């Protein structure tokens, strides 16, 4: 089976990112590049790049060789500390990590077809306080400020 699909999974060692990596590799026709701050063991179709997504120069240098990437799955999130009221302090760094990584891949690869932004329950405002239950996917999202 030809391996012409190549994915970059940003946040590859996180809760969601590691399952995206696992799923893509299980499908058999993907090559996967995982990005995270921590190093990770590589495999036959898996390469890992340890990178600081907030350091634009580090990102540009380390991702410049990704000329054949077709997909980016963005699952990284840098949490803040303290109460939900401090959530506004994590918006800028998370936005910057997203912009830095996707921009670097888009510049390196002329084959980029799709970027997938993986979101969670913060889309609905769970970080702002109690919500109605049960929640439904059709519930309205909370309005910005948010990095999503």
Report the location of each language-model feature.
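Structural motif
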Residues: 6, 70-71, 114
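Flexible cofactor-recognition loop at the NAD(P)H-binding site
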Residues: 14, 77-81, 121
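Conserved Rossmann-fold NAD(P)-dependent oxidoreductase catalytic core, especially the SDR/UDP-sugar
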Residues: 74, 99-147
């Amino acid at each position: 089976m030809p391996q012409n699909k190549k994915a970059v999974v940003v946040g590859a060692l996180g809760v969601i990112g590691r399952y995206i990596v696992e799923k893509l590799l299980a499908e058999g026709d993907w090559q996967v590049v995982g990005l995270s701050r921590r190093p990770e063991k590589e495999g036959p179709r898996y390469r890992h790049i340890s990178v600081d997504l907030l350091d634009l120069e580090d990102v540009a240098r380390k991702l410049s060789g990704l000329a054949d990437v077709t997909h980016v799955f963005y699952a990284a999130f840098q949490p803040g500390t303290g109460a939900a009221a401090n959530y506004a302090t994590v918006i800028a760094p998370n936005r910057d990590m997203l912009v830095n990584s996707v921009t670097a891949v888009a510049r390196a690869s002329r084959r980029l077809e799709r970027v997938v932004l993986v979101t969670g329950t913060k889309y609905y405002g769970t970080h702002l306080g109690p919500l109605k239950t049960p929640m439904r996917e059709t519930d309205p999202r909370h309005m910005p400020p948010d990095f999503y």
